[in-house]
């Protein structure tokens, strides 16, 4: 087999594996979230269908995907129909440039668990994942429903504001490492526990986590939907499979965000003592992913004015200050 044919086959297999695994994980995450929230609220959660309620996930999927697909008569039908697909596609495309595990050898060929190892991977991931909000805005606007439009507009304002916070935090990382490649950033943290960037950039870590909650539509910083204010927000008119596509895209973005935090701040997939790198990657990413559930259970929903004031009066000034301090540290 020629090198090009092997490369093409390898890339195709990687794409199929990523879609299959992360679509499954997105569904499994719903079960995990229900169990975690039940524990916080002193409930049991799903426990009737299958062992530990695991088959409840299958029952919910059957129910969701067999529901009638309703398109409102006064909506922009084409945009309304494709917006959920854009959301899911952008979430999965962003995973293409994220290295998941250490490289390994298969049939004499070195395999890197990444579809595209590009030198601007960080820019690619942030750009493609940010497009998920473009789908949210299109879906809300095309619904021609006041709650959907309000949710879409609130989400758009939030993502424009908090992208600045996340970008400034990441620029500090790039200044230290000297590269936009996620593989290079991972390798920068290969000298042991105290080489992790969370110790060199603790403020950037906090700022990026906050921006991540906005980008993934998670409580307490979710502005696109609120039962007490705008019903289901951008998703008010969606049902069945189309609502499920938004749902899969959101959870895939959450998983990608957890992996990205691990790569940027927590040592990535480097080995720790006698623990292999791939185990460390799974453990650390799962720990970050758990934060989504913990925050939803522990914190109240913030008002839009509180979210925006926090961004412009606190977070952006802190991000700029962190950037200036990092620049001085690099120069000196």
Swiss-Prot record:
GO terms for cellular component: plasma membrane. NDH-1 is composed of 14 different subunits. Subunits NuoA, H, J, K, L, M, N constitute the membrane sector of the complex. It is a multi-pass membrane protein. It comes from Campylobacter jejuni (strain RM1221). Keywords: Cell inner membrane, Cell membrane, Membrane, NAD, Quinone, Translocase, Transmembrane, Transmembrane helix, Ubiquinone. GO terms for molecular function: NADH dehydrogenase activity; oxidoreductase activity, acting on NAD(P)H, quinone or similar compound as acceptor; quinone binding. GO terms for biological process: aerobic respiration. This is NADH-quinone oxidoreductase subunit H. It comes from the Bacteria. PANTHER family: NADH DEHYDROGENASE SUBUNIT 1, NADH-UBIQUINONE OXIDOREDUCTASE CHAIN 1. Its main location: membrane. NDH-1 shuttles electrons from NADH, via FMN and iron-sulfur (Fe-S) centers, to quinones in the respiratory chain. The immediate electron acceptor for the enzyme in this species is believed to be ubiquinone. Couples the redox reaction to proton translocation (for every two electrons transferred, four hydrogen ions are translocated across the cytoplasmic membrane), and thus conserves the redox energy in a proton gradient. This subunit may bind ubiquinone.
